[in-house]
Regions:
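Conserved beta-strand hairpin/beta-sheet module of binuclear metal-dependent hydrolase folds
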Residues: 1-45, 133-143
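Conserved beta-strand segments of alpha/beta enzyme cores
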Residues: 2-4, 48, 76, 104, ...
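Residue-level detector of conserved, well-ordered beta-strand and adjacent loop positions
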Residues: 4-7, 19, 107, 113, ...
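Residue-level detector of beta-strand face positions
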Residues: 5, 17, 111-113, 118, ...
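Active-site HxH/HxHxD metal-binding segment of metal-dependent hydrolases
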Residues: 26, 33-113, 195-202
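Active-site neighborhood of phospho(di)ester-bond hydrolases with catalytic His/Asp-centered motifs
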Residues: 28-29, 50-57, 77-80, 123-126, ...
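Metallo-beta-lactamase
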Residues: 86-92, 96, 118-206
Length: 206
């Protein structure tokens, strides 16, 4: 699997590019800002961008979406339906043009195909109602649900601490030692988070 990442302004959001090099097909995850950097990351892959995947609808994860749609009109943009309202509110607040025709939704248990890659969708509410985690091969694209040594905030509009704990417990119960690629900060391993992350440890005891 092809894999690349950049940090995007304004809140140093990790934006990821995943792809199947044989099929020359890629997807961008959480293009939160710095559209010129996101576009450069896509173009240097020498693959065709097929979709935009959003782990949730907060502005620091969707800020470059409309710039990408200006360059690649009609590109599908996937988001969980429970976060459609936050995403649309963000568009209004930041005066982003509406590209609703490109909007798609995905939910728990869905599997997206990207060449030979299979992207598994887990609904992990808590940081936001529609937060998702994406699993592809041995990589966990965790959004703002799980961080290295921590977890996402739940005291934001739409946040729910109990739901977040349930989501962390679900992630902790997964088989395998995924590489955890969070929405902010450095990567980790799921085994390490199970052992040392106090939030995940607490969640798994409940």
């Amino acid at each position: 699997m092809y894999f690349d990442t950049i940090e995007a302004a304004p809140l140093m959001t990790n934006c990821y590019l995943i792809g199947d090099e044989k099929a020359k097909a890629c997807a961008v995850v959480d293009p939160g800002g710095s559209p010129e950097k996101v576009i450069a990351m896509i173009e240097r892959s020498n693959m065709e961008i097929k979709m935009i995947l959003l782990t949730h609808g907060h502005y620091d994860h969707i800020g470059a979406v409309d710039a990408l749609l200006e360059k690649w009109p009609g590109l599908p943009v996937y988001i969980h339906p429970a976060d459609l309202c936050p995403a649309e509110s963000t568009r209004e607040r930041y005066r982003m043009p509406d590209k609703g025709a490109s909007q798609r939704t995905y939910g728990d248990g869905d599997v997206l195909e990207l060449g030979e890659l299979r992207i598994h969708v887990l609904h992990t509410p808590g940081h936001s109602p529609g937060s998702v985690v994406l699993l592809v091969e041995d990589v966990m694209l965790a959004g703002d649900t799980l961080f290295a040594g921590s977890c996402g905030l739940w005291d934001l509009p739409g946040g729910d601490g109990d739901a977040l704990m349930a989501s962390l417990a679900r992630l902790g119960a997964l088989e395998g030692n995924y590489k955890v690629c969070p929405g902010h900060g450095h990567a980790s391993l799921l085994d390490r988070e199970r052992e040392y992350n106090q939030f995940m440890r607490q969640a798994m005891k409940q």
